[in-house]
């Protein structure tokens, strides 16, 4: 087995593809690596076995290492591709603006699909664990409520491929005047949004108590939050810094289910849920959708009276298999709802044409709904008088929104200016034996060196160890229990165990050890 301490890639050094060990940093991260496409005879021979299978994700077969991306499944499926948008989504005092903040995070959380190729990560083994951390400097909020990505001071990385995914006209959508912000401009923008929200609230015949509560919210939302109003006038050393920690554990192997938890305590934000996917193969493309135990992603704002949002997953298809040009298309709809504020959002991913390049179009609506009688499931079915805002655009490029009753189009998020961000993990020699990067390092090292036979052998050894451990538990009638999470099969709300809380506290502390 290679020594992980001898395969170090410093964060700011250029990538040297001809020396693959330098692609691995001392914390085990593979920096910007996505191997060349090809080997389609091998792919097609495997796919022939998948035709007609209802759920490929439940099959027990081992892919050769050369078809895998050198990254663990738990690490790949995190929900924080842009920690800055995660940290600010609950900042606004206006409830509609908070929903728009959740939307901005939702469209940036999977930036890897925009900046990277479609890949297959390692299948997680039972009990596998992944944790990482980001430290975000209070970002500068522009007049249009988008963030200046450079102001977050996040360690980003770029690849030749990721740069080609950026639309040349992306940034030109935003006028130069709106690329900077002041406290007055933010206050003006938030006042306008509060007025629009207030009009929509008054149009509904709510009870007196609801009206009073709404009026109180409107009054408080006319002033910008402290972070927004003071941010521009502070130097980078004076700005607040916020720690974000992501934790995930493989809680079940058959079916494959993992639990995750993300938190930014200083902002009072928690995100949690369970991941499970079902995959089918039609002969020309894969269809991916949420499994039965995957109820969606929960978002909670502790500093907003525990305001909670439930975000459901869309479906997706992976096409271009026969042409050797893999691409992902999002399908169907996503619903984001908040019973406390009575605001619901429907996001619809527009069906692609049979011919031509994918357009990646999306549209949606934010509206008032009745949590006790929630029967609307399409944009067309939303009553016009309940609409608060509408949005549309390209989920790989720019998305725009308009407040109800206004013709002015505003920027929701511009993905062209965003790059992927490094994760801060402990060095390999400080990681738990069952942490993702530690478990899979022998496979990763050999894939980067293009020693695919050795990589496949190392992968099979890991899988054999898991089978032996499973057989031993079965023989001794021992039930395996997750270390860090208590799963929730009914609602998909996992909770941290005492051991999980301890690891979380350690990860949030200033003494948290991470790689260079």
Swiss-Prot record:
Disulfide bonds: none annotated. Residues 178-187, 218-238 have a biased composition (Polar residues). GO terms for molecular function: oxysterol binding; sterol binding; sterol transfer activity. Keywords: Endoplasmic reticulum, Phosphoprotein. GO terms for biological process: intermembrane lipid transfer; lipid metabolic process; sterol transport. Signal peptide: none annotated. Residues 197-206 have a biased composition (Basic residues). GO terms for cellular component: cytosol; endoplasmic reticulum; membrane. It comes from the Eukaryota. InterPro entries: OSBP_sf, Oxysterol-bd. The gene is obp1. Belongs to the OSBP family. Coiled coil: none annotated. The modification Phosphoserine is found at residue 182. It is found in: Endoplasmic reticulum. Residues 168-240, 459-501 are annotated as: Disordered. This is Oxysterol-binding protein-like protein 1. Its main location: endoplasmic reticulum.
């Amino acid at each position: 087995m290679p020594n992980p301490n001898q395969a170090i890639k410093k964060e700011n050094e250029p990538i040297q593809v001809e020396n693959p060990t330098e692609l691995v940093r001392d914390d085990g991260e593979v920096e910007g690596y996505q191997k060349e496409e090809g080997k389609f005879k091998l792919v097609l021979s495997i796919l022939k076995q998948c035709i007609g299978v209802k759920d490929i994700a439940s099959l027990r077969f081992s892919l050769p290492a050369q078809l895998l991306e050198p990254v663990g499944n738990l690490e790949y499926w995190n929900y924080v591709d842009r920690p800055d948008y995660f940290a600010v989504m609950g900042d606004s005092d206006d409830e509609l603006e908070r929903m728009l903040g959740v939307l901005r995070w939702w469209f940036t959380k999977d930036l890897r699909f925009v900046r990277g190729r479609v890949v297959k990560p390692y299948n997680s083994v039972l009990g596998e664990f992944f944790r990482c951390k980001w430290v975000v400097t209070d970002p500068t909020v522009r007049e249009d409520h988008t963030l200046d990505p450079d102001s977050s001071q996040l360690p980003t990385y770029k690849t030749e491929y990721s740069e080609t995914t950026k639309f040349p006209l992306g940034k030109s959508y935003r006028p130069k005047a709106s690329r900077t912000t002041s406290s007055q401009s933010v206050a003006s923008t938030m006042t306008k949004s509060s007025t629009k929200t207030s009009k929509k609230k008054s149009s509904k015949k709510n009870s007196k108590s609801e009206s009073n509560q709404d009026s109180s919210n409107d009054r408080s939302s006319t002033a910008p939050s402290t972070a927004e109003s003071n941010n521009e006038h502070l130097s980078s050393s004076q700005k607040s810094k916020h720690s974000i920690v992501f934790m995930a554990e493989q809680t079940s192997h058959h079916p494959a289910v993992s639990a995750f938890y993300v938190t930014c305590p200083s902002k009072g934000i928690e995100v949690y849920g369970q991941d499970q996917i079902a995959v089918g193969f039609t002969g020309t493309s894969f269809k991916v959708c949420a499994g039965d135990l995957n109820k969606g992603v929960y978002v909670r704002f502790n500093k907003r009276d525990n305001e909670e949002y439930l975000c459901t997953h869309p479906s997706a298809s992976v096409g271009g298999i026969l042409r050797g040009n893999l691409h992902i298309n999002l399908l169907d709809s996503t619903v984001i709802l908040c019973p406390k504020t009575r605001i619901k959002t429907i996001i619809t991913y527009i069906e692609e044409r049979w011919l031509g390049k994918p357009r990646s179009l999306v549209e949606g609506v934010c509206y008032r709904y009745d949590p006790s009688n929630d029967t609307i499931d399409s944009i067309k079915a939303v009553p016009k008088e309940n609409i608060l805002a509408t949005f549309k655009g390209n989920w790989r490029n720019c998305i725009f929104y308009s407040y109800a009753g206004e013709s002015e189009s505003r920027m929701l998020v511009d993905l062209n200016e965003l790059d992927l961000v490094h994760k801060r993990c402990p060095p390999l020699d400080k990681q738990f034996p069952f942490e993702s990067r530690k478990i899979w390092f022998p496979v990763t090292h050999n894939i980067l060196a293009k020693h695919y036979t050795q990589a496949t052998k190392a992968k099979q050894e890991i899988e054999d160890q898991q089978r032996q451990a499973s057989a031993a538990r079965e023989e001794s009638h021992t039930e395996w229990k997750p270390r860090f999470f208590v799963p929730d099969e009914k609602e998909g709300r996992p909770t941290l165990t005492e051991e999980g809380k301890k690891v979380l506290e350690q990860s949030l502390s200033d003494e948290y050890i991470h790689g260079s």
